[in-house]
UniProtKB/Swiss-Prot annotation:
Keywords: Ribonucleoprotein, Ribosomal protein, RNA-binding, rRNA-binding, tRNA-binding. The keyword RNA-binding applies. This is Large ribosomal subunit protein uL16. Residues 1-21 are annotated as: Disordered. Part of the 50S ribosomal subunit. Binds 23S rRNA and is also seen to make contacts with the A and possibly P site tRNAs. InterPro entries: Ribosomal_uL16, Ribosomal_uL16_bact-type, Ribosomal_uL16_CS, Ribosomal_uL16_dom, Ribosomal_uL16_sf. SUPFAM superfamilies: Ribosomal protein L16p/L10e (SSF54686). It comes from Bifidobacterium adolescentis (strain ATCC 15703 / DSM 20083 / NCTC 11814 / E194a).
Length: 139
């Protein structure tokens, strides 16, 4: 699973979810990609589930690139705990994804295989997404 090797601080503030993506809006490595249409926190487990769904479908052909990284810890207090007494412990790591961000890319496979593999990965993600091609248009 994707987690940072080390961080300067154990806990961070929650990231802002509004606004459009400032960079990473175009396909950089592969031929097809998944672009976010809504803001969301994507956990390291969701990224891994999407990666497995894609790689299992394309089998040995092609290559997958993950262009987001879960670098923010999200804290949670235990169930049944009263309010107060400090911030909770880090539960999981998230990537803050803004609309327009390309999260996964795939290359080296046919368009039909790429479309189906990316559709399976989209089912694992918590927000609305679309499949885009390197030319810039929808598939």
């Amino acid at each position: 699973m994707l987690i940072p090797k080390r961080t300067k601080y154990r806990k961070q503030h929650r990231p802002v979810r509004r606004g459009m993506s400032k960079g990473g809006n175009e396909i950089a490595f592969g031929d097809f990609g998944i672009q976010a249409l809504a803001p969301a926190y994507v956990t390291n487990r969701q990224i891994e589930a999407a990666r497995i769904a894609m790689t299992r479908y394309i089998k040995r052909g092609g290559r997958v690139w993950i262009t987001i990284f879960p670098d923010r810890p999200l804290t949670k207090k235990p169930l049944g705990t009263r309010m107060g007494s400090g911030k909770g412990t880090p539960e999981f790591w998230i990537a803050n994804v803004h609309p327009g961000r390309v999260m996964f890319e795939i290359g080296g496979v046919s368009e039909d295989v790429a479309r189906e593999a990316l559709r399976r990965a989209i089912d694992k993600l918590p927000m609305k997404c679309r499949v885009i091609a390197r030319e810039g248009g929808d598939i």
